[in-house]
Amino acid sequence: MTVVLVHGNPETDAIWGPLVDALGRDDVVRLSPPGFGAPLPDNFPATYLAYRDWLEGELEKIGDPIDLVGHDAGGCHVVNAMMHRPELVHTWATDAIGIFVPAYVWHDLICKPICQGAG
């Protein structure tokens, strides 16, 4: 079973270092969303659908049963992908489920693209 970790904004996959060390496993994959710890391709539209499709594509490449974990904006991508393609994983968890509460307040670094309708 592969563990896949998706970090948020403005982090890099280094945020998962202590957890990966504690797990003591060699089947952990740390994914960095385009533009957040990974290069942003010129033609990548950076919309919530584009990030969903990116994550689904990465999960398809792994192929093994997957336990998926998302944090912050990475957790938003996890929820979006799992609502669309739940069969891609064995289990999933996120700390970002609160984004579905109408009164949720986005932090400043993620609010710019989302709150202005760009993402």
Q: Locations of the language-model features?
A:
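Conserved HGGG/HGGXW glycine-rich cap/lid loop of the alpha/beta-hydrolase fold
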Residues: 1-39
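Structural signature of beta-strand start/N-cap positions in the alpha/beta core
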Residues: 2, 27, 64-67, 88-91
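Short, flexible active-site-adjacent loop segments at beta-strand->alpha-helix junctions, enriched
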Residues: 9-10, 72, 98-99
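Active-site signature of alpha/beta-hydrolase-fold catalytic machinery across serine-
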Residues: 18, 80-84
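Active-site loop/oxyanion-hole signature of alpha/beta-hydrolase fold enzymes
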Residues: 30-69, 100-102, 110
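Conserved G/P- and acidic residue-centered "switch" motifs that form tight phosphate/ATP-binding loops
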Residues: 35, 74, 91
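Gly/Ala-rich beta-loop-alpha elbow adjacent to hydrolase catalytic centers
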Residues: 70, 74, 78
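Flexible "cap/lid" loop of the alpha/beta hydrolase fold
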Residues: 83, 90-119
